[in-house]
């Protein structure tokens, strides 16, 4: 009888082991994630991130000049939906910049990439709730992240806002 008990126990253990999920690892699956990083960091910035960021910055805040006071915030559901979609582009641009093949390092670059995504998420939430102050603050955070990253990784970059301000003062 002990043999029958041992055989039954062995059969039970084997059955349980056969039903359990196989261990998953990169080595056992043989396939690592593959990312298409054909676009350079500069192309991602110019073609993806900058247009979306410009939309957010151009849609938050106000202007007070000789013509008077003008709020820049969206005034329709469609307008808020559009800036929310552009904020989602900013979120994903942060992820795109963190991909292997684009990330410059695993240190500050990753912190800035994450900060970019966080600013985009903040802008998305503010657009969803149509909260003007939160939307403005999300734009400010986005500007801070962009400026800090450029100072750290490309200090020679021309800040187009400084250039535009210089052009305006030259007109005076």
Protein language model features and the residues they cover:
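The canonical Cys-X-X-Cys-His
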Residues: 142-153
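Bacterial N-terminal signal peptides that target proteins for export
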Residues: 1-8
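Hydrophobic membrane-targeting segments
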Residues: 20-22
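Extracytoplasmic c-type cytochrome modules immediately beyond a signal peptide or single-pass transmembrane anchor
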Residues: 24-143, 158-172
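Hydrophobic helical h-region of N-terminal Sec-dependent signal peptides
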Residues: 9-13
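Short glycine/proline-enriched turn or capping motifs at secondary-structure junctions
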Residues: 6, 151-158
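C-terminal motif of bacterial Sec signal peptides marking the signal peptidase cleavage site
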Residues: 15-18
């Amino acid at each position: 009888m002990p043999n029958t008990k041992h055989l039954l126990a062995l059969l039970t253990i084997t059955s349980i082991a056969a039903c359990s999920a196989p261990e998953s690892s990169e080595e056992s699956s043989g396939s690592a994630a593959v990312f298409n990083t054909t676009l350079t960091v500069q192309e991602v910035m110019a073609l993806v991130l900058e247009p979306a960021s410009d939309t957010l910055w151009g849609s938050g805040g106000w202007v007070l000049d000789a013509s008077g006071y003008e709020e820049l915030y969206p005034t329709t559901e469609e307008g808020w939906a559009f800036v929310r979609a552009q904020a989602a582009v900013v979120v994903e641009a942060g992820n795109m910049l963190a991909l292997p093949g684009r990330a410059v390092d695993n240190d500050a670059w990753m912190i800035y990439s994450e900060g970019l995504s966080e600013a985009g998420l903040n802008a998305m939430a503010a657009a969803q709730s149509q909260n003007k102050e939160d939307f403005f603050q999300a734009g400010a955070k986005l500007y801070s992240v962009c400026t800090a990253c450029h100072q750290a990784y490309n200090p020679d970059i021309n800040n187009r806002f400084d250039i535009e301000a210089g052009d305006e003062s030259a007109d005076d």
